[in-house]
Amino acid sequence: MLYWALVFLVVAIIAGALGFGGIAGASAGIAQILFYIFLILLVVSLLFGLFRRAR
């Protein structure tokens, strides 16, 4: 589960760099949406990983 959290972190950083950096002007809105989606998935994966190890 920690593996997926790291994958989501990397994807969120890439999407954020493209969306907020203005590199891809036409797809900036999509990149910003993807940033938030993968950021939420990162947090969910981290929480599941922590609860799974606590048992």
Curated annotation (Swiss-Prot):
One of its GO terms (cellular component) is plasma membrane. The keyword Metal-binding does not apply. This is UPF0391 membrane protein Meso_3110. Keywords: Cell membrane, Membrane, Transmembrane, Transmembrane helix. The chain crosses the membrane at residues 4-24, 30-50. InterPro entries: DUF1328. Belongs to the UPF0391 family. Signal peptide: none annotated. It is found in: Cell membrane. It comes from Chelativorans sp. (strain BNC1). It is a multi-pass membrane protein.
